[in-house]
Amino acid sequence: MTQTMKHLFPILLLLAPLFAGAQGADSAAFIRPPYLQPGDTVGIVSPAGKLPLKTDTAKIRERIESWGLHVKFGAHCADREQPYFAGTDAERAADLQRMLDDPSVKAVIAFRGGYGSVRLLPLVDLARLREHPKWVVGFSDITMLHLALRKLRIESIHGPMPAGFHFDGKEDPSAESLRQALFGETVCIEVEPHPLNQPGTASGRLAGGNLTVIRSADGTPEELTAEEPTVLLIEEVGEFVYRIDRMMQSLARSGKLENLRAVVVGHFSEMLGMEKFGVADACAVISAYTRPLGIPVVFGFPAGHTDPNLAVYLGRRVTVGVDDTGARVEFARED
């Protein structure tokens, strides 16, 4: 070591924490895709299950165009040749990658969930979105894509998908919430009081989605972790209640609940085996794990397999407030 370096070494040691802090701050930032503007184009793909026969793509196009947007459908989004999936893995991955790479497409919306998104992860390059970010939208099985985007620190939208839009002449608050999220209008969602709510106020980045998909990602590159202040969103459909308990046990035993700042519990719809398990609903099972945490918990949040299913920004800093009058989830305007 030269004499100059010997003199500089103590100074560098003193400055090291400052550089580390600056690096940590930069790495903590999430990339926020640009909000949509009238005249923009959205791409619709089917990364998982094939569409129901009753799906009316013409009405879906008309609905989205009424928002002032243009629509591109993936080449295989309506394929029905496979027993379950909307095309082969290669076809679905190619559709998704084309929409991700198309500079004219400002948001990529999953047509529906089901199962199959995880099969595309080895075949697509989501990292390109760090250079040219755009919104990825969906819920349920699409949670796997959200988890992958979280690892890349890119915000995404957990929300309704076109296959679930209503065309019965009545208002469709789910679809309207998606429009609001795409155009950057979602600021705060208020929820009615729930007997299992836990009071308090806390902030963190919103993460999560479908509970089964979250647990299935354990041990993979997409595994959900909470090293930073995190607000966990969970929802589920069609599961036996004992499996909900098993998954909550796994979250607790793996330490994934320890660093949470708040929990937002969406709808647990069409639950099975409740009488046999001795509970009135899945919320009672979840509450047994969240209550000892001593953090704000919101039950009955309108997200998941429910109507309305409101769109929320994953990766966004949120503030959760819960009291006797209800609950509020506020989305930060700046990162």
What are the residue ranges of the model-derived segments?
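Conserved beta-alpha junction segments in alpha/beta enzyme cores
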Residues: 41, 51, 55-59, 63, ...
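Hydrophobic h-region of N-terminal signal peptides that target proteins for export
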Residues: 14-21
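Internal helical hairpin/lid segments
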Residues: 224-282
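Positively charged n-region of N-terminal signal peptides that target proteins for export
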Residues: 1-8
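ATP/NTP phosphate-donor binding region
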Residues: 23-104
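Short, acidic/small-residue loops that bind anionic groups at enzyme active sites
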Residues: 124-148, 155-161, 296
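Conserved anion/nucleotide-ligand pocket segment
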Residues: 155-219
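ATP/nucleoside-binding phosphotransfer catalytic cores, i.e., glycine-rich phosphate-binding loops
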Residues: 267-335
